[in-house]
């Protein structure tokens, strides 16, 4: 059956042919995978003067905005991969229904700078049980869970025209030799919807209008002790919704 979208429907559809997977390990909003270290971080630097008002990374509005941008595909089963120093490997998953492929060194690793090769033991690619369809003109940007700083693997970033191609088989760069055990539910990759558009761009010196726009923008933030940037965002959203 061919999936179709109504012209006014702005929906992303994820599906699987694996019975029960949507209940056991579903694709989720990326905001459900905010890393623990960020959650535990204080907004203010501890043991500083109360009036110093020195904030930490948690006060940076770009961080929570980034965490909410898309969707996360969690690993759907336990996985064990053993990579020997001579390049031999074997893998085992907790369910024989889940299959894995390998990108040989000649496909990726051997083309990297030396320092990057040192951090690449093997590239593993799952036969991902999830498929996705986006509205016309919308691609998905595949990203690693950057701020999770996973010591075992990193998924390679890239873009997929998911309005016409619905497979998402992630390329996992394993960092370590020996046995790597990755548990079911580990966030595998983040997917951010991006609209395919072409933009013109200009590089020039500042104009009076540029300076005025910057001063207005800066004052919206500087005129508040806290949440000036966030309040500017809310005002912009309200204006957008009224148009």
Where is each model-derived feature located?
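Non-catalytic terminal segments and appended small domains
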Residues: 1-165, 171-243
